[in-house]
């Protein structure tokens, strides 16, 4: 992949851009195999490769510059700004969307926030696309509510220019710290969420819910999880750290008793919408802490699926699963190092199969899916 910003030394977010893509995949696979060398897997499946450009469905842009000539991109620690509207990780048509947003920022008088001076209003724009429909969600992250009326008044022009923007909102983030979003969300449109479809499964994206940024690989990851689980012929499962329900909904059928747990109420609302659309009556989603939920239960289902944040599932949940010994654990991870530590702590389990999914090309990061089977006495 060619990137003018990388070549010019303006952006090095893609740390591995100087490696061939085949070398990137090989290095990631070797890294994963080294991490799991003490817990040998029965089956190592080949890594799932990604598109190398145009694969991202979400842009998180720092807004800088002036209200007349805003920039959308990133802010270096030394205060330098870089416009990344031509970033090749996004589909090319995102550039036209960004240009219209820049014009709108000027029309609406949304002064970019100046970090050094602690002045201005508009901090970020967050753009997400549904690949299924082409519809988009646009969020303006503002320092205060001062410009809300001004923003809303100017919206008809933006909606005329970009009719694919079906969800538009403002998030209020008043603190000076480098926090992407705040607690308050103001939605300006009739539609409150985007609908995405992976493998025939409807999934929903609300403004403050997490969703994977590489839809092709996310779709393959969910489909693989569903296929592995169906081969086990189970009737009950938990989906811990379930997000918008992508994993559990791919694994469950109308007979499966599925409980999905996620701390984010926004994500749980999305998961419930999906389950309702699919007519899954034995599926339940709850907005709770996954570890606290599990530790409170005296009985476990046949399979526990975990998809934790980068820190892993942690000591308490590892000890609980070791003690309660569900027959299967399906572990999905965005941090293979913490996953390897967790698996090492699950001493009574063996890895039946493991596969790498290249969710983040041109970086050292990747997703892993591992099926663990209880092998204790």
Swiss-Prot record:
Keyword Iron-sulfur on entry: yes
Superkingdom, natural source: Bacteria
Binding site for S-adenosyl-L-methionine: 212, 241, 262, 307
Keyword Iron: yes
Enzyme nomenclature, EC number: 2.1.1.189
Disulfide topology: none
Signal peptide: none
GO biological process: one example: rRNA base methylation
Catalytic activity entry: uridine(747) in 23S rRNA + S-adenosyl-L-methionine = 5-methyluridine(747) in 23S rRNA + S-adenosyl-L-homocysteine + H(+)
Enzyme category, top tier: transferase
Gene Ontology MF: a single term: 4 iron, 4 sulfur cluster binding
Catalytic residues (positions): 334 (nucleophile)
InterPro entries: 23SrRNA_MeTrfase_RlmC (IPR011825), MeTrfase_TrmA_AS (IPR030390), MeTrfase_TrmA_CS (IPR030391), SAM-dependent_MTases_sf (IPR029063), U5_MeTrfase_fam (IPR010280)
Residues that, per the record, bind [4Fe-4S] cluster: 3, 11, 14, 87
Entry keywords, A to Z: 4Fe-4S, Iron, Iron-sulfur, Metal-binding, Methyltransferase, rRNA processing, S-adenosyl-L-methionine, Transferase
HAMAP family: 23SrRNA_methyltr_RlmC
Family recorded in the similarity comment: Belongs to the class I-like SAM-binding methyltransferase superfamily. RNA M5U methyltransferase family. RlmC subfamily.
Function: Catalyzes the formation of 5-methyl-uridine at position 747 (m5U747) in 23S rRNA.
Protein name: 23S rRNA (uracil(747)-C(5))-methyltransferase RlmC
Taxonomic lineage from the root: Bacteria, Pseudomonadati, Pseudomonadota, Gammaproteobacteria, Enterobacterales
